[in-house]
Amino acid sequence: MCVSFGDLGAENKHFNTNPVRSFRLVLRVLDSTLREGELFRLYPSDVRVRVASRLADSGLKRVELTVDYPPRTSFGDVVPVVKALRDRGVEVVMHGRACEEDIEAIRRYKADGCALYIAVSKLHREYKLHGVSEDEVIERLCTAVRVARDSGFGYIRATLEDSSRIYLEDGEEGLPRIANSIQRLKESGATIVSLPDTSGLLTPRLARDFFARASAFSPLPLAAHFHNDYGLATANTIEAALEGAEEVHATLLGIGDRNGIADTYELVATLEDIHGVRTGLNRSSLRELYEYFSRVTGIEIPWRHPLSREARTVRAGVHQSMTVKRKEGYIPSRKLENDFGEPLYAISPYVSHNLVQTIITPHTGTIDKEKTRRIAESLATVTRDGATPPSLDAVQEIIRNETGVMIPRQELARYFGGERVYILLKLHPQFPAQRLVKEAMEWEGVEGVDEVYGEADMVIRAHITYGKGSVVSLLRQKFPDALQDLKVLVTD
């Protein structure tokens, strides 16, 4: 059966104005951190299993893995990850080429589904597939889908790689060809079709139009997979979701080939917090998931990411002055509720005297505006000309000099955050260092652990807040017999 462009419907000439188009109860998020994400960085086997478990614990119900390609990867590398996911009720989708060899490899894992891809654009067909015709690549994909169907897979995703280029280059003429391809794939047994923006060419307006049109003519659910070459992957994926895509692809921190794809947090938080779209994830678990992933992989959360320490930090004095009264004035209330709890404040030349007043009044019992201003000016002076912000000890001293009150560092950390430190450990020679490494990487505040040689055996990079659950107190509590010496160096 062929689908003519006339069958697509006149309504496709206009953008859909409905903010959420014909949604099922829950939008399905497919996390590809352990497939697409491993194009950015390969993880050790034990890390992959731990990350898989955390993905499941956050509520993700569909996770994508790559079929093994010996000798670079092996069956034994992938099996423990599949088991960790399936034991937690996660649907495992194995990604491979549209060929019988890869389908046979996928069968061995007893995965729930398979994702089969082939390039369809003229550029890719000519230079990657050696000049084969569009009809031939679709027939190859249909053949692979039929093999997957006969193998008993319940989920079969057919990926028309680089399909956005057809839409961009061929416009109206390209859409009927995509419609034809989807119809052939449906008849072959595909359960969902992915229309990826393989080279990150689309903008949100174009992504919205592409998926509005495709959703109208597609007899199969659509998956959205956008690359981030212009920094628009998450925005494009959101637009596709609002126009009817039933599966959206993302990774933690958006990692993937080149500069990645949509970011799981940015995608889920925006859809849930702003558009009211349910994704099935535990929204409030995402910050912990990201911090854990950063610790065990060594991939830092960038400063401009919505879950970074910087995203939580209010810098402008007038902003600080309002935020101490109504914190949602500058940080979205759903982010405070689910991610941060409370804002942090930067000590800079712009520090607010109202912030200082909020900190000291519970301890002084009175409001002395002149002293408050002098404290604020002293803090501002310390950071003038780009100097490093003062330590919490220095802040304590500045306040004490004006008020005679010593405010606990733990209390100051509530406003200014903990301090970034290097913790140098000297261990007893017989103690198994990996035991400490493995446990410390699970602790909140730890950024990384390195074994070293010299005066110390191990260096822990961390943020400490001086409470009972700080990294230093946990080390002394849990490993008293392992430590010969412990030193803390505060950094900026």
Feature roles, as predicted:
Residues 91, 115, 194, 247-250:
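Short hydrophobic alpha-helical runs that function as membrane-insertion/retention elements
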Residues 5, 19, 27-29, 36-63, ...:
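Alpha/beta enzyme core
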Residues 69-87, 92-105:
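N-terminal active-site wall of soluble small-molecule enzyme domains
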Residues 4-23, 27, 33-35, 277-415:
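A mid-to-C-terminal "edge-of-domain" accessory segment
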Residues 198-321:
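Catalytic alpha/beta core domains of metabolic enzymes, predominantly
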Residues 60-68, 247-248:
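Divalent metal-dependent hydrolysis catalytic cores, especially in the metallo-beta-lactamase
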Residues 404-492:
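A compositional/biophysical signature of low hydrophobicity enriched in polar/charged and small residues
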Residues 67-73, 96-100, 118-122, 160-164, ...:
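Active-site-proximal loop/turn and secondary-structure-junction residues that shape catalytic pockets
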